[in-house]
Amino acid sequence: STKGKVVESKTDNTGSYNFKLDPLLSYEILVSNEGYLNKKLTETTVGIDENKVFVVDFVMDPVKKEIILPKIEYDFAKWDLRAKSIADLDMLAEALKDNPNVVIELKSHTDYVGNDRSNQRLSQKRADACVKYLVSIGIDPAQLVAVGVGEKEPFVIENKDGRFKEGDVLTESYIRKIKFKKNREKAHQYNRRTSFKVLREDYVPNTDEK
């Protein structure tokens, strides 16, 4: 809190937690659990003049799962970040600040339009652009590894979406068999993605003054 007081609370077997908040204070709530990335949110009682129950729910990301950043999009054959892509990268930056001991791989994928070599180069430039932005807002470059894989890793559908079933692998041959153009384009959109996953959890930040 803004008093500098630290309050620890463990969840019960349903994942619920509770503690009393003092008036006229702002709180920073940090949650952690083995196998998941730390997550932080803020809440405040400043300006609250009556009793109130605050409900603060957390959705935690598993360390071992590859996380897709859905808002990161690019113009065709470009690697410049669109304005709305910045929001996802800003959220990723906050996650890295909450988890200073992790090193992540930031991976960019393309669709099957164009040839393999150009798609590989394009995806690497896109991954590099994401890393460059994160470094520009204060993330330690040693926490970031940029990888462009081109079209080598087709997306696997996780949840049924119209004609796409859970487990469908969106390979080039699969997409060619799709009858309707709008569904083919949707498959390409699934393949065009940027994601990250945790490589290490033992990084020690360099705190030496330069």
Regions found by a protein language model. Give the residues of each.
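Solvent-exposed, polar/charged alpha-helical surfaces in well-ordered, non-transmembrane soluble domains
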Residues: N13, A87-E94, I104, Q120, ...
